[in-house]
């Protein structure tokens, strides 16, 4: 979980920007989107295979 403490003489916008940056670096949003709905193992394998194929031919 990301935590951001507002520093002395720091605006709320700056603190929010630091919080958003730390959340995006930790990958929290992507993880939530990935786990939003159940994905069957066969579908996971298929997506993984397609991603590898896409990387290979890029």
Swiss-Prot record:
PROSITE patterns: RIBOSOMAL_S21. GO terms for biological process: translation. Pfam families: Ribosomal_S21. One of its GO terms (cellular component) is ribonucleoprotein complex. It comes from the Bacteria. One of its GO terms (molecular function) is structural constituent of ribosome. InterPro entries: Ribosomal_bS21, Ribosomal_bS21_CS, Ribosomal_bS21_sf. Keywords: Ribonucleoprotein, Ribosomal protein. Belongs to the bacterial ribosomal protein bS21 family. HAMAP family: Ribosomal_bS21. This is Small ribosomal subunit protein bS21. It comes from Staphylococcus aureus (strain NCTC 8325 / PS 47). The lineage of its organism: Bacteria, Bacillati, Bacillota, Bacilli, Bacillales.
